[in-house]
Amino acid sequence: MVTERQQDILNLIIDIFTKTHEPVGSKALQESINSSSATIRNDMAELEKQGLLEKAHTSSGRMPSVAGFQYYVKHSLDFDRLAENEVYEIVKAFDQEFFKLEDILQESANLLTDLSGCTVVALDVEPSRQRLTAFDIVVLGQHTALAVFTLDESRTVTSQFLIPRNFLQEDLLKLKSIIQERFLGHTVLDIHYKIRTEIPQIIQRYFTTTDNVIDLFEHIFKEMFNENIVMAGKVNLLNFANLAAYQFFDQPQKVALEIREGLREDQMQNVRVADGQESCLADLAVISSKFLIPYRGVGILAIIGPVNLDYQQLINQVNVVNRVLTMKLTDFYRYLSSNHYEVH
């Protein structure tokens, strides 16, 4: 069990270590901890026994272990403080006109990368919860066409496909009509269910040639299940992550899944310190925070960095960006709901 004084010592060691990246000795703690040097050394030894501190090879000082950072994250972080001195710079970064949701998310990721020196990922609303608000088919050539989806009036997804053999022009019109009548206004999850339950019977009723039509439905809608993800500062991973982690970030859909699984449905914010047993994010820290996307749901901002982060500072920065981002998104969707349209 960690005593209150030991927790204060651990917090102070982490605070000093994240700024200096040097082992911390008992003398460096005496000004802030109202105890003798011997008492502090005993407490440091006890923290080491509990696996929260570890000895440095070249110094008599101690530094936090991964378990120590995990304990700090769980027991000492303040998730409600704002870094007032950085509010102006963050607000200033968003003081521009945006024409696409992805551009707003990218600005958020770029800003947090510049502030933190880490890798940042921004996720849109979970794909299964987005609604299909518009659909069209554009014929590209004799054998190819493009399905164009609009989700939540703000995200465009396209899927190119081969027109089935023996498909007539009127069959493409039927396909378009069925999708517009049956799917518009429904969530992607509802559409997935309808393709498996309702569409097979409808195909039999409306199409003379039914070969591969159900496969065509599944093909053109597959893209809608992909996460809308933006990333910034991937190259920063080379400063603190192993090659496997860097290569993992070449798979954005897997990255999105990893981030979502690290944040429970009832959590708005979480700090996860991954140990060496978690191969894809081994010895990395992930600070993830949900933000409101007005009229649509919530997205996620995630900072990925080394274990020895200045967690409190980064939490402050994420909180400020979240609030400013939500205000900007409110203006953006108010604009979309007027007589204006997003430029794609």
UniProtKB/Swiss-Prot annotation:
Role noted for this protein: Negative regulator of class I heat shock genes (grpE-dnaK-dnaJ and groELS operons). Prevents heat-shock induction of these operons.
Record's keyword annotation contains Cell membrane: no
Gene that produces this protein: hrcA
The family this protein is said to belong to: Belongs to the HrcA family.
GO biological processes: negative regulation of DNA-templated transcription
InterPro entries tied to this protein: GAF-like_dom_sf, HrcA, HrcA_C, WH-like_DNA-bd_sf, WH_DNA-bd_sf, WHTH_HrcA_DNA-bd, WHTH_transcript_rep_HrcA_IDD
Keywords attached to this entry: Repressor, Stress response, Transcription, Transcription regulation
Protein name: Heat-inducible transcription repressor HrcA
Record's keyword annotation contains Transcription: yes
A GO molecular-function descriptor: DNA binding
